[in-house]
Design a protein with these regions (language model features):
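Short hydrophobic/aromatic beta-strand micro-patches
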Residues: 50-52
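Conserved histidines in hydrophobic membrane contexts and catalytic metal-binding motifs
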Residues: 32
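Catalytic core of pol beta-like nucleotidyltransferases
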Residues: 1-29, 37-43, 56-105
């Protein structure tokens, strides 16, 4: 089991390490937002992830499997949201703050 992530850089490195598994789940983009993106995380902070799936591939199984995989790899509670699920009030802030992780094609 991997140790718990403590920095934004550790999160990005681990996400890149599992890029092939992310592609198998039809993930096209991942964006980090929240306390880790702002370098304001605490020991009990969760990891906030914005996900974009390939067209027609967003489904319950891919969403839940992504959530389980991220929690396993990062060893933290993870909140995964899609662009479509964002509130019209907070969504623009999240989209502006999100730092997208490049993990190849």
């Amino acid at each position: 089991m991997e140790p718990t992530v403590h920095t934004k850089e550790e999160i990005i490195e681990r996400l890149r390490r599992i890029s092939s598994e992310l592609r198998e789940l039809s993930v096209e983009r991942l964006g980090l937002f929240g306390s880790f993106a702002r370098d304001e995380q605490r020991d009990d902070s969760d990891v906030d992830i914005l996900v974009e799936f390939a067209p027609g591939r967003k489904n319950f199984d891919n969403f839940m499997n992504l959530n389980f995989k991220l929690e396993d790899v990062l060893q933290r509670h993870v909140e995964v949201v899609t662009r479509e699920s964002l509130s019209p009030y907070i969504g623009p802030h999240i989209l502006e703050e999100a730092e997208y992780v490049s993990f190849g094609n």
